[in-house]
Amino acid sequence: RRMESEGGGFNLAAMQKDLLINVVPFLNGGNVHRLIAKILSRDPDGTPDFEYISELLEQAEPGSHGLFFLPYVTGERFPIMDSSVRGSFLGLSQETTAADLAQSVLEGVAFSIRQGLELFDQPAKKITLIGGGARERRWCRILSNVMGQKIFVYKDPDLLPALAIASAVFVAEGVIPDYQAFISTLESRGHCDTVEPDPEISARYHGIYQRYKGIYPLVREFYSEKY
């Protein structure tokens, strides 16, 4: 069905007749994960240290001890459309730890995704993560708790975008009848893990998320001024 949303969301005509693909161009996701892995890297050359981020996330607490991160490091197109805005930490204190920094950054991305999905006229029925960032299962856990929904992660999630694009060719060439055939094959043959939300943590995140939504309106004017 046609998507009517705010932000930079739009519709693409799919290869399959009378089917629309709802596209929401989140600009900040895996790049933010890579950025914090670079900033906190133990490597003198600053090579992104994803292993260290995983270790920090194991130590972290939901809510990052009051630290918030607005993840728009390259501007954003969805859930807000603003090319001037940039990433921001709010709530830094003398007690802030590296684990808080790592946790808050990935929480910020999760909050942004939740805010974007809430712009749709219907709630998401199923959330499947793709891309390299899905390899960080602690981040998947954060997203599941922020969304309050089960998250599905298939084997080799970084390859799924290429397979999905290939499925369009399969439909066009008649190799498969429709996209549902591709999805059914993936569900039956592709190894899939699920991440379940923790009800107590999800309830806590709901309140934190309400505060997060107030950050962008506060900083928008600051970033809109040119110097």
Stretches with model-predicted labels:
Residues 1-130, 135-227:
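Active-site core segments that coordinate phosphate-bearing ligands/cofactors
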